[in-house]
Design a protein with these regions (language model features):
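Dinucleotide-binding Rossmann-like beta1-alpha1 core, especially the glycine-rich loop
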Residues: 46-123, 268-271
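Flavin (FAD/FMN) cofactor-binding core of flavoprotein oxidoreductases
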Residues: 119-122, 142, 290-292, 296-360, ...
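Glycine-rich FAD pyrophosphate-binding loop
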Residues: 24-43
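Beta1/beta-strand and adjacent pyrophosphate-binding region of the FAD-binding site
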Residues: 1-12
Length: 395
């Protein structure tokens, strides 16, 4: 049986970029993904690159590295990620004071430009002028997240990386070390295993009696077929409820996140939309805090709510065909990401729970791959310290 240097669990954008970067270091890597046809946060991503949103030295450094990486990624991977610079329009509700909202953005690396209603509608003609009191304009990047992930996977395979489609059901232990994984169909051995399973990372690790403070919301959004009109910007609300919802997760106990999942779901809606280069539109999104990762949310109710709220800002989108989808979106309340060795167990790592996933994950994957081979990296070491300080010992 082959013993790999690394097993990476999960082939969304985080697992794909990490597997690629590990293989770039000459390591023998196995990537295991449960779904041959992906159905995850990568597939349903807006694709936005909020490199402007750094608030301290760490996030500003990574924001700069992240946008620079994406500008050159198509060339590096020899495949089109559909990267482009695209203005972000943050709409301000009619009842809100634009100057007050602007002040809320003063802490970011790039200060937004405050637009009048008229100027906002000139920049994005599809906006409803009667629904807003103004807007904030920011430079933003955009990619096709699934095509970017596929580009990473193809480059990974060119580096002799191996991809297997199977479901990981347990970790293989030998003494105080993890030495591989058990899937539904086989076992695989490795010196190191890293979990990049997004919102499912927590439940996967729980099966191995490892507690991790990696949480998730259930996102619901609408994807449309290509349309014959153009949305020229990324449109999102200036006051986003999702971050408030994630902050409320701090009030939950560990028991709330464990079966039998008695906590009633709490949901918010941030109305926004983006159009891809092929003409498809993604609009949403509802975020629901429901500890059961298999929770069943009503797609018909969600679609009606999304259409009502989005059409208030972008009336032309109200009746266009589209299908409501859902996925888990991972987050944590400790750091910009959960990266590093888990508990007191050798050979098991996590790479999940990102803020600004598309900006931070690719550059942190590059840093992590070099760090595990002995290159000093203060950012990865800082993130490891966060995990070490909060991680309970193995049950």
């Amino acid at each position: 049986m082959t013993t790999y240097n690394w097993i990476v669990i999960g082939a969304g954008i985080t697992g794909a970029c990490l597997a690629y970067e590990l293989s770039q270091q000459g390591l023998n890597v196995l990537l295991i993904e449960k779904d041959k046809t992906p159905n995850n946060a990568t597939v349903y991503s807006y694709g936005g690159l909020a490199y402007w949103s750094g608030t301290d030295k760490l996030t500003r450094t990574l924001g700069g590295e992240g946008i620079e990486l994406h500008r050159n990624l198509s060339q590096e991977l020899d495949a089109d990620t559909e990267f482009r610079d695209l203005d972000l329009v943050l709409t301000i509700d009619r009842q809100d004071d634009p100057e007050v909202i602007l002040q809320n953005y003063a802490r970011f690396a790039i200060t937004p430009e405050l637009l009048s209603v008229n100027d906002a509608c000139i920049l994005e003609p599809l906006l409803n002028p009667n629904a807003i009191s103004g807007a904030l304009k920011l430079p933003h990047g955009h990619i096709h997240t699934q095509k970017t992930t596929e580009a990473y996977l193809q480059a990974f395979e060119r580096n002799n990386g191996v991809i297997i489609y199977d479901r990981v059901i347990d970790l293989l232990h030998q003494g105080d070390s993890v030495v591989g994984v058990q899937t539904e169909n086989d076992t695989y051995q490795a010196d190191n295993t890293v979990v990049c399973a997004g919102g499912l990372s927590r439940s996967l690790l729980q099966q191995a009696n490892i507690e991790v403070e990696n949480y998730y919301t259930h996102a619901q959004l609408i994807l449309t077929p290509p349309v014959d009109f153009e949305l020229g910007t990324v449109v999102m609300p200036a006051v986003q409820q999702r971050f408030i919802l994630e902050a409320k997760a701090r009030e939950l106990t560990t028991e709330d996140w464990d079966p039998p999942y008695d906590l009633a779901p709490k949901a918010i809606l941030d109305p926004g939309a983006v159009q891809f280069l092929d003409g498809r539109i993604c609009m949403g999104q509802i975020s629901a805090l429901a500890p059961n990762p298999q929770a069943k949310l009503n797609p018909f109710k969600a679609e009606a709510e999304i259409r009502e709220r989005v059409s208030n800002v972008l009336p032309l989108l109200e009746d266009i065909p589209g299908t409501c989808h859902s996925c888990l979106v991972a987050f944590n309340n400790k750091a910009i990401a959960l990266i590093g060795n888990l508990a007191d167990i050798k050979g098991i790592y996590i790479f999940s729970g990102f803020t600004s996933t598309l900006v931070f994950a690719p550059v942190l994957a590059k840093r992590f791959a070099r760090w595990v081979l002995g290159k000093e990296d203060k950012i990865i070491e800082e993130l490891q310290l966060v995990i070490s300080a909060t991680q309970p010992h193995q049950n």
